[in-house]
Amino acid sequence: MLILVSPAKTLDFDNPPGCESYSMPTLLDQSKQLIEVCRTLTPTDIATLMKVSDKIAGLNVARFSSWQKDFTPENAKQAVFAFRGDVYTGLDADTLSEASLQKAQKQLRILSGLYGLLKPLDLMQAYRLEMGTRLANDRGTNLYQFWGDIITDEINKTTEEQGDEFIINLASNEYFKAVKPKQLNAQVITPIFKDCKNGQYKVISFFAKKARGMMVRYILDNHVDSLEALIKFDTAGYYYSEKDSTVNEPVFLREAQ
């Protein structure tokens, strides 16, 4: 199975990575085209486009300006160690064993507005470019049009090479919209995580994001390779609810925290 997750806005380029091994992103030529578009934007443009403060806009102007395609461990960092945020808190990549890291390199892919699709150990330079950004480019008015079939084709190439029957979609709607499910050659499974609040089970964003990361960790550490094994996920008190689930959307519930 191949797992898809979203990136994170929060980045860590200060602390050393959890391992020395690294790989290179497959779609860097595409990234370079986007960087060239982003370099035409002023801080005011970025603040408006990304709905961020002037300080963050200025930071991103500097990031786009200093971005260079020749990645090395000195000027870039492996994606799974660079991203911070709720999903990555749940995954806790810094404590993955070498075996689980290598499994992640094969099984996990990170969707990205700038890089398209990243393997966990792919080097990346700091950026902020969310997939939903309406960045006009040569291919259209937004990043979905820019990426077109490219990300989907890359996923299909990977699943064909590895013989993956299932794609476990643990990405947000914003990012999974960059994938064209009808063109995929594997069955898409989208786990749903609900927490009990005021007597009702609801998707609570903070908890759901963290749960996605915990499920990635569960898959890697427990060598999960079937849906039967996947629904045994029980980290942090979650449990599979058969009556609330469908074939493609297994639902996991948790009592009030």
Curated annotation (Swiss-Prot):
Classification via Pfam families: H2O2_YaaD
One GO location term (cellular component): cytosol
InterPro entries attached to this UniProt entry: YaaA
GO biological process: response to hydroperoxide
Highest taxon above the source species: Bacteria
PANTHER family reported in the protein's UniProt record: PEROXIDE STRESS RESISTANCE PROTEIN YAAA, PEROXIDE STRESS RESPONSE PROTEIN YAAA
Similarity comment text for this entry: Belongs to the UPF0246 family.
Protein name per the record: UPF0246 protein Shal_1126
Species per Swiss-Prot/TrEMBL record: Shewanella halifaxensis (strain HAW-EB4)
Phylogenetic classification of the source organism: Bacteria, Pseudomonadati, Pseudomonadota, Gammaproteobacteria, Alteromonadales
